[in-house]
Design a protein with these regions (language model features):
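C-terminal closing repeat unit and adjoining cap/tail of repeat-based domains
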Residues: 2, 47-48, 73, 107-108, ...
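A sequence/structural signal of beta-propeller blade repeats
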Residues: 1-162, 169-176, 187, 266
Length: 277
């Protein structure tokens, strides 16, 4: 796979070196590898003070296991993270799977306190997949016991090293946005605690679209309308301030683009070139 990191503000890009053959072979030539994996690549926030530093994570979803390569612009090298079987990470001992429990089209990927979080698409599974970018290790994290809508979660930073979790709960046709906080390692309780329940709407299905830093982005379909006998249903976007939990309308996406992917774009990415006078 060829990959490049782009700086849209300065219209620059850096072409990454290929993964060394020996690293690729160590991951691809595996006894359990029967099919070509689907891959995803994304930026990894780094703690370095250098403005031009960046990291890239290349994730390979095999049918029975998960493998990861990580690139650092500081070392200019790829590093292989030990692959893990899905039955070790999310399925429990003694079980197996023939498909990745992370859906390539509908899953959400969230970042908080140096860790990435993914929601499993397995029905009834109460775990999040976690990757610690400092330890370069996979693990799992439990979810709140309350029944939440599938594929409708978001992880945020709640402050003081505590995790925050947003989820949508539906009951009798009414949708609520539930906000949970998980205590940090220094607190007596590390269980999820319900912080607040925010009524969203009735009759129309809301969806968590993205989350980053300060804001959560919700999508909510509006009422059906007809234009020249053709049905249209627009998607309204609502932002949620993670600190104040205040809701605000952002914009409305027309019917033709309502089901397309959406991300939050805030601040500017690290420049790929050092500042010059």
């Amino acid at each position: 796979m060829e990959a490049a990191v782009c700086d849209p503000l300065h219209r620059k890009y850096v072409l990454l070196p290929p993964v060394p053959d020996d690293l690729a072979a160590s991951m691809m030539h595996h006894p359990a590898t029967a099919h070509t994996p689907w891959c995803e690549a994304f930026l990894v926030p780094l703690d370095e003070e250098a403005e031009t530093a960046f990291g890239v994570m290349w994730m390979l979803h095999f049918t029975t296991r998960l493998a990861v390569f990580v690139y650092s612009s500081t070392t200019r090298h790829w590093q292989a993270v030990a692959s893990k079987e899905w039955n070790e990470l999310l399925l429990g001992k003694g079980k197996s799977t023939m498909v990745s429990p992370i859906d390539r089209d509908f899953y959400g990927r969230y970042y908080a306190y140096g860790c990435f979080y993914w929601e499993s698409t397995m029905m009834g599974k109460k775990d999040l997949l976690v990757f610690d970018t400092r330890r370069m290790e996979f693990s799992s994290c439990d979810l709140p016991p309350k029944e939440l809508c599938p594929l409708g979660l978001a992880i945020v930073e709640a402050g003081e090293a505590r995790l925050g979790l947003f989820g949508i709960h539906v009951e009798a046709g009414k949708f609520d946005l539930c906000y949970y906080i998980k205590g940090n390692k220094c607190e007596s309780s590390s269980q999820w605690q319900l912080e607040k329940t925010i009524p969203i709407c009735s009759g129309c299905w809301p969806d968590i679209k993205a989350a980053t830093g300060r804001y959560l982005l919700l999508g909510k379909f509006g009422p059906m309308r007809f234009v020249n006998s053709t049905a249209h249903e627009d998607l309204e976007y609502i932002s949620v301030d993670v600190k104040t939990l205040q809701l605000a309308r952002v914009c409305t996406k027309s019917s033709g683009f309502a089901f397309s992917k959406t991300w939050i774009y805030t601040n500017f990415p690290p420049s790929l070139s050092s500042p010059k006078i």
